[in-house]
Swiss-Prot record:
Domain free text: Consists of 3 domains; the N-terminus binds the ribosome, the middle domain has PPIase activity, while the C-terminus has intrinsic chaperone activity on its own.
Chemical reaction(s) catalysed: [protein]-peptidylproline (omega=180) = [protein]-peptidylproline (omega=0)
Pfam families: Trigger_C, Trigger_N
GO MF, any single term: ribosome binding
Species of origin: Chlorobaculum parvum (strain DSM 263 / NCIMB 8327)
Taxonomic lineage from the root: Bacteria, Pseudomonadati, Chlorobiota, Chlorobiia, Chlorobiales
Range of residues in the leader sequence: none
Gene3D superfamilies: 3.10.50.40, Trigger factor ribosome-binding domain, Trigger factor, C-terminal domain
Entry's localization field: Cytoplasm
Protein name (database record): Trigger factor
Enzyme Commission (EC) number: 5.2.1.8
PANTHER family recorded: TRIGGER FACTOR CHAPERONE AND PEPTIDYL-PROLYL CIS/TRANS ISOMERASE, TRIGGER FACTOR-LIKE PROTEIN TIG, CHLOROPLASTIC
HAMAP family: Trigger_factor_Tig
Length: 427
């Protein structure tokens, strides 16, 4: 057997395999004999069709089958011998039987060769969140809003109130536009931006007030649109008093007093923002290393990530896209993001290889012990059994390996902790 490897690009190779008749003939004869036994031709007993006739009938398909078998048999051995790292399935480009030889040309993609940058040259800032009593009170207020009651008020609307009114579109002369009325529209001032024209016009208004609102055009040269809002009602969310009885109701008896409830809210907030800090750091590190390693990405790898992103988007839309969406065009818009995913996979695999990272059964057990602390209803033994199952093992190995890769990165880069306040949010 002869073999010739040609580099087509940084991520593509072509392998030429040349086999002598002595090497491929046994396979050819076997395929021919199997065909002879199974093919039925009128006028001949099954298994007794003349070889010459059989070759004329199925010669091309027989040769294709033999070429496929020979390519499959020899490619993996050559890949091991030549240290080829395929990134896609090998495809037969061509084959030729002639002069006592079988020549097969196979194309495939490979992982590109590249050098990792010195990780110690990179610095990152990690947010260090500390939950204050004020943060806890804000979070509890959000929880109480879910148990509040909307009540009608006579006073002027404040920033957290809701106004209900009829909205009428006006023409340039201030007259109502035909079919331009929207009755009982709700304006929740809390969720309107501070510079929203409706919010600016309606704050401080009471039931019975009428106010005109001018909405400036989004595009230069456009005309402003005028509206009149006739306020019919102002509502305010009245929050219940936080006491032990409400705590029992909110937590379904998990906590029996306000003190314990507040302590748990603080604990949950701290856990959430500690996790957010870690995830933000990991994302910043991977984004930087993707940027610093502009390695070429195999097409098959990119296509795989494109399809993954497409399916994720489809799931978020309830399992199918709107009919108006051109799926092929949308798939193409996902390509830049897919290339980043592929590049990160190449970089992370390189880090794992250079640091000889692997996942052992002991690693899986340690991971199960850590997860069991988060979920007291499950024992370590139950989790180990699940993680070692055929269905979950590959996923768990991948998860643990990712952790090890990030641990290597964190051990080499410089990380500066920065005290950061908990961001305020509305609800």
């Amino acid at each position: 057997m002869q073999k010739n490897i040609t580099n087509v690009s940084d991520t593509e190779q072509q392998l030429e395999i040349i086999l002598t008749a002595e090497e491929y003939q046994p396979e050819y004869d076997q395929q021919l004999e199997e065909a002879r036994r199974s093919i039925k031709i009128k006028g001949f007993r099954q298994g007794h069709v003349p070889v010459g006739m059989l070759k004329k009938m199925i010669g091309p398909s027989l040769e294709a089958e033999v070429a496929e078998k020979m390519a499959s048999k020899h490619f993996s051995a050559i890949a091991d011998e030549e240290k080829i790292n395929p990134a896609s399935r090998a495809q037969i480009d061509s084959f030729n039987f002639g002069d006592g030889e079988l020549t097969i040309k196979i194309s495939y993609e490979i992982h590109p060769e590249f050098e990792l940058k010195d990780l110690s040259a990179y610095s990152f800032t990690q947010a260090e969140y500390s939950v204050t009593d004020e943060d806890v009170e804000r979070e509890i207020k959000l929880i109480l809003k879910g148990h509040g009651t909307m009540v009608t008020i006579e006073e002027a609307a404040g920033e957290g109130d809701t106004l209900i009114g009829d909205v009428t579109k006006l023409d340039a002369d201030g007259n109502a536009v035909e079919n331009g009325k929207n009755e009982n529209h709700h304006f929740n001032l809390e969720y309107l931006p501070a510079d929203n024209p409706f919010r600016m016009a309606l704050e401080g208004r009471k039931a019975g007030d009428s106010v005109e609102v001018n909405v400036e055009p989004k595009e230069e040269g456009g005309e402003a649109i005028r509206y009149r809002v006739d306020v019919k009602e102002v509502k305010r969310l009245e929050l219940p008093e936080l006491d032990d009885e409400l705590v029992k109701e909110i937590t379904q008896q998990r906590f029996e007093n306000v003190t314990d409830f507040k302590a748990d809210v603080k604990l949950q907030l701290q856990a959430h923002f500690t996790d957010k800090s870690e995830q933000d750091l990991l994302e910043a590190m991977s984004a930087k290393l993707i940027e610093e390693h502009p390695v070429p990405t195999p097409k098959a790898m990119v296509a795989s990530f494109q399809n993954m992103l497409l399916e994720n988007a489809k799931r978020q839309m309830g399992g199918q896209f709107p009919k108006s969406l051109n799926e092929a065009e949308f798939l193409e818009t996902l390509k830049p993001n897919a290339e980043k995913h592929a590049r990160w996979l190449l970089v992370s695999q390189k880090i794992a290889k250079e640091n000889e990272l692997n996942v052992t059964d002991e690693d899986i057990k340690a991971y199960a012990e850590k997860e069991a602390e988060k979920e007291p209803s499950l024992t370590v033994e139950q989790l180990v059994s699940t993680y070692m199952s055929t269905e979950f093992k590959d996923y768990i190995i991948d998860t643990i390996l990712k952790e090890k890769i990030y641990d290597v990165i964190k051990s080499k880069v410089t990380i500066t902790k920065e005290a950061t306040p908990i961001p305020e949010h509305q609800g």
